[in-house]
Amino acid sequence: MAPNLRKSHPLLKMINNSLIDLPTPSNISAWWNFGSLLGICLATQILTGLLLAMHYTADTTLAFSSVTHTCRNVQYGWLIRNLHANGASFFFICIYLHIGRGLYYGSYLYKETWNTGILLLLTLMATAFVGYVLPWGQMSFWGATVITNLFSAIPYIGQTIVEWAWGGFSVDNPTLTRFFALHFLLPFVIAGLTLIHLTFLHESGSNNPLGLVSNCDKIPFHPYFSLKDILGFMLMFLSLTTLALFSPNLLGDPENFTPANPLVTPPHIKPEWYFLFAYAILRSIPNKLGGVLALAASVLMMFLSPLLHKSKQRTMAFRPLSQLLFWTLVANLFILTWVGSQPVEHPFIIIGQLASFTYFTILLILLPITGALENKMLNY
């Protein structure tokens, strides 16, 4: 009998072992769909981004006009731009749900997979930030100014780093051209990191909702989960096209319809919605360096998750106290996101400070203590 090409060809064999004959736990739920959705998001963003880059000019005098030209005069340029801008939002929705799943079901105990995942999140955040600057609207310009300025809080070398990043003494043409170069490059870095992420994942196999070893009950990825993933793709594309066609500017800032002007500061400088939780944490500390450290800690703290796992059970499926804390954390993140979008005045300042304090307390103190407490309760 002739050998099956899918199982013998060096390249096809790798694809087969990753996407076709991959042994998969039979009980993984829809929460395990977001990894493949993130892959589709990345492919969509690279494709639409490439088409946009063909019509974009990375120059301060022409950037805004070139984006306008794309939307008005290029065939379906408006659609490509709307899909790209809103695709970024869906990318972040998927990655936040993917991380939430990891925290809830103890997936962070696969340390290498988890750590590469955090690196992926950081790279995605960097990509989205430099991408937001490219249309060269008011919020693009002032967002770039404010966020890059945070590096000046680093003692001794901070100011030098900022001027080096800007390519001058303010955000200007050199900044825009290098941000375009970075925005083109970073998605391919994300693609490379994704392959590393998957390599580490396939070393151990997937976790599952029960957190039990599932070697005795695995099924092939195709056709079962390939079909399930296609359903996920369809639902996501339906949501994305609905948003891009019916309300493309829902998540954007009206300020960005005004070309960048260094002489006029917008009344409220705020990032896109997916950074608001971190922005609220940054603003809640009335000291520049302290705020920057809190901002960095809000994401980098996830590297500690595997070390702070004190429970004898892997997932939160049978741990009601930890579940309560987890959903409190989710609600807290919604509050932080809302506060980040509000002006810096009386009720919002204190709400932001309390929510920031709660965020760190739950992750660093309450979850490990609760895990240890639940271990004690197992004895009774």
Swiss-Prot record:
Residues that bind heme b b562: 84, 183
Q: Name one GO biological process term.
A: mitochondrial electron transport, ubiquinol to cytochrome c
Classification via PROSITE patterns: CYTB_CTER, CYTB_NTER
Location(s) in or outside the cell: Mitochondrion inner membrane
GO molecular function terms attached to this record: metal ion binding; ubiquinol-cytochrome-c reductase activity
Q: Which domain of life is it from?
A: Eukaryota
State where a ubiquinone binds. Answer: 202
Q: Which keywords accompany this UniProt record? A: Electron transport, Heme, Iron, Membrane, Metal-binding, Mitochondrion, Mitochondrion inner membrane, Respiratory chain, Transmembrane, Transmembrane helix, Transport, Ubiquinone
Which Pfam families does the entry mention?
A: Cytochrom_B_C, Cytochrome_B
Record-annotated membrane-spanning stretches: 34-54, 78-99, 114-134, 179-199, 227-247, 289-309, 321-341, 348-368
Membrane topology field:
Multi-pass membrane protein
Q: How is the cofactor bound?
A: Binds 2 heme b groups non-covalently.
Residues bound to heme b b566 are 98, 197
Misc. comment: Heme 1 (or BL or b562) is low-potential and absorbs at about 562 nm, and heme 2 (or BH or b566) is high-potential and absorbs at about 566 nm.
Cite the PANTHER family for this sequence: CYTOCHROME B
Q: Its function?
A: Component of the ubiquinol-cytochrome c reductase complex (complex III or cytochrome b-c1 complex) that is part of the mitochondrial respiratory chain. The b-c1 complex mediates electron transfer from ubiquinol to cytochrome c. Contributes to the generation of a proton gradient across the mitochondrial membrane that is then used for ATP synthesis.
Q: How does it assemble?
A: The cytochrome bc1 complex contains 11 subunits: 3 respiratory subunits (MT-CYB, CYC1 and UQCRFS1), 2 core proteins (UQCRC1 and UQCRC2) and 6 low-molecular weight proteins (UQCRH/QCR6, UQCRB/QCR7, UQCRQ/QCR8, UQCR10/QCR9, UQCR11/QCR10 and a cleavage product of UQCRFS1). This cytochrome bc1 complex then forms a dimer.
Q: Tell me what this protein is called.
A: Cytochrome b
Instruction: Supply the source organism for this entry.
Output: Pelagodroma marina
